[in-house]
Amino acid sequence: MPSSASEQLLRKQLKEIQKNPPQGFSVGLVDDKSIFEWEVMIIGPEDTLYEGGFFHATLSFPQDYPLMPPKMKFTTEIWHPNVHPNGEVCISILHPPGDDKYGYEDAGERWLPVHSPETILISVISMLSSPNDESPANIDAAKEFRENPQEFKKRVRRLVRRSIEMI
């Protein structure tokens, strides 16, 4: 059975990332039988609250990739304004293409077929460095980030330590 264009593209992109891995993350397949499910390890970026942490996540690609974006979900507990309590990452680049019906994002900030898994992961590392508390996915984390930054830092550092212990 021939591979779909989506499968061929994902195989090529996975091979490229594994051959020349950018600093801060590594990727592989959840199961060798499906190119549509990737496991990701993100290393908390230097000079951030998440520094030194090891955060596991999955990237789930739709059959119509790259026309539509994948979904990303942390499987390691993380406390961040732009990560839903269930681990789903909420950043513009992962939102479907087109206009935002709520008017928070420009169409150019959302998913475009020219994006790649690498651009997504770089955006997630940037998100860890600079949380956006203006349109949060986790309202409690955003509120604590704004109103009680010391407690926010303590909670994040505790989860970073836990992520290291889980390795």
Curated annotation (Swiss-Prot):
Root EC class: transferase
**Catalytic activity reported:** S-ubiquitinyl-[E1 ubiquitin-activating enzyme]-L-cysteine + [E2 ubiquitin-conjugating enzyme]-L-cysteine = [E1 ubiquitin-activating enzyme]-L-cysteine + S-ubiquitinyl-[E2 ubiquitin-conjugating enzyme]-L-cysteine
Q: List the disulfide bonds.
A: none
The residue ranges of the UBC core domain are 5-165
Any one GO molecular-function label of the UniProt entry: ubiquitin conjugating enzyme activity
Any one GO CC term of this protein is:
nucleus
SUPFAM superfamilies in the record, alphabetically?
Answer: UBC-like (SSF54495)
Q: Which CDD domains match?
A: UBCc_UBE2G1
Keywords attached to this Swiss-Prot or TrEMBL record, sorted alphabetically, are: ATP-binding, Nucleotide-binding, Transferase, Ubl conjugation pathway
Active site location: 90 (glycyl thioester intermediate)
Superkingdom of the source species: Eukaryota
EC numbers on record: 2.3.2.23
Protein function: Catalyzes the covalent attachment of ubiquitin to other proteins. Has a role in the formation of chromatin structures that influence the localization of transcriptional silencing factors.
Designated name of the protein: Ubiquitin-conjugating enzyme E2 15
Q: Which organism is it from?
A: Schizosaccharomyces pombe (strain 972 / ATCC 24843)
Q: Which gene codes for it?
A: ubc15
